[in-house]
């Protein structure tokens, strides 16, 4: 069984960070080692929350503990998401290096959580670290549209510009870029776009965009997690991408149908493993 060290936020109530990632990966047959960067009562979009960030030294100590019992060689991938402090970002790099020293075949998937144009933000210093340093150590990066713009330092309005931006980012280190949400000025307003780019291919896919009054939090976290799991399970890039699109759609649709704000991950678990609705991806740049 594949093992993922998932370094993300934790909420006591609801689904965000590891709370949106652990269950989908496990439901797909991947073992998860959750390492929480923060412990909050709930996600921050409620406007009020309690809790705090975990000290970076404690994160390092926990991973050192795993190494001390000889388990780090079993780690097949590291997935990082929301970081609470710049020191945690540096700790993630040290953790990735430790994992790769123990298992040279391990992959690092970086979800560079910086927030959205209109939504949440991260603490000062984290965005700069993610932009400056993380591409150099990442095997795969999973930004949303606004995060991709920050990573390359310019606005992106079309699919072609997004593909070019991903390829530019890949020159700094990543072998693949998954754009979890792509805003394309030429797309229909009721479509949610995703894009995945490698050195040899680029695939685009769409699912319905559900008109929530308040968009659920954790969709991006779940998207990265499903893609990590399907990749580790041996899917091709296209297959992992399409399964991710379909599984996430199933959860979001169940959330919409239930009239909920928090993701209906448990209710939609069978569709995470075996989605009923499938969305075919298409080549947008054969490279």
Curated annotation (Swiss-Prot):
UniProt keyword terms in alphabetical order: ATP-binding, Kinase, Magnesium, Nucleotide-binding, Transferase
One Pfam entry name: Phos_pyr_kin
One of the GO BP terms on file: pyridoxal 5'-phosphate salvage
Enzyme kind, highest EC tier: transferase
EC number: 2.7.1.35
Needed co-factor(s): Mg(2+)
GO terms of molecular function: ATP binding; magnesium ion binding; pyridoxal kinase activity
CC per GO annotation: cytosol
Annotated metabolic or biological route of this protein: Cofactor metabolism; pyridoxal 5'-phosphate salvage; pyridoxal 5'-phosphate from pyridoxal: step 1/1
List of residues binding ATP: 111, 147, 180
Residues the record lists as binding substrate: 9, 44-45, 221
InterPro entries reported in the protein's UniProt record: PM/HMP-P_kinase-1, PyrdxlKinase, Pyridoxal_kinase_PdxY, Ribokinase-like
Subunit-structure text: Homodimer.
Protein family per UniProt: Belongs to the pyridoxine kinase family. PdxY subfamily.
Known function: Pyridoxal kinase involved in the salvage pathway of pyridoxal 5'-phosphate (PLP). Catalyzes the phosphorylation of pyridoxal to PLP.
Protein name: Pyridoxal kinase PdxY
Annotated organism of origin: Paraburkholderia phymatum (strain DSM 17167 / CIP 108236 / LMG 21445 / STM815) (Burkholderia phymatum)
Chain's gene name: pdxY
